[in-house]
Amino acid sequence: MMPSWKSESFSRAAGGVAVCMAVGLAVARADETAEFSGPRAFAHLQKICDLGPRPSGSAAMVTQRAMLVEYFRAAGGTVSGQAFTIRDPRTGNAVHMENLLVEWHPDRPERVLIGAHYDTRPFPDRDPVDPKGTFVGANDGASGVALLMELARGMPALATPVGVDFVLFDGEEYVFSQRDPYFLGSTYFARQYAAGQQTRPPQAVRYRYGVIVDMVADRDLGIWQEQRSVTWPDTAPVVDAIWAVAARRGVRQFVPRPKYTIDDDHVPLRMIGRIPTCDIIDFDYPHWHTTQDLPEQCAGESLEAVGGVLLEWLRGQR
């Protein structure tokens, strides 16, 4: 991120039980009354970070993708991949990327999209000491994925007429200079979705709302309302509803005022895909794009604050 459909060509993403077992990720039984567990979510974050940096096209990204495919299938989701290819902005060589779609209750045509990027920036370019060093991306990369992994426990038993899709975007920040484009995966997804909406019958899949979760594990969490999300007339009600849930739950980390204008995956989803999508993000994170974006800067309590609010909001969809 930077401050301020379902395609018919989806390919089945590769995955293996051995990969899932190797990283020690267990899937809990679905439970209609299950509450979001911060410790479980943090364990997912740690296991993802144990893979090391996960930039698009890397071996660690391929391993992570296989792990996630197996995890979400075991949790009861219908998982598919949306593959696309871009050119490396430095060399012109092909880089293969893939968004992951996890469908819950695919028979329900009215749907909500919950998205997060699962790639990491190639380098910690804001690090004052080593801007070409190792970037693990615990908060900026792993936190949104870990949140969706724990949120999956409550999805099979979701007793609403609305289905839910998790979308894990590749290529959110495959960026080597300020000239390089961001949001490659969400832009591709939005274009495919928009094209499909023009040709499909009225009863086809339609996204009622979208929510992006990004950088949601900071130990000192503060989720201010993102400026675009409260300014766009079709996304402002989504923000109001989510922050109202936070207020009812007494989750003080959700601040009911706007602060930053942030370019993130919600922008192409809304501007290209016409999906009313808001951004849930803590942009007051001192370790952003540095070598210190590590699990020790994150907390399960923060993941639980955000995940618990989202789970209750989803359960309230009618």
What are these regions, as identified by a protein language model?
Residues 37-47, 60, 64-71, 141-147, ...:
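Stable alpha-helical elements in mature extracytoplasmic
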Residues 101, 111-115, 165-168, 208-214, ...:
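Structural recognition of the beta-strand scaffold that forms the well-ordered cores
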Residues 132-234, 265-266:
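Acidic/histidine-rich catalytic neighborhood of metal-dependent amide-processing enzymes
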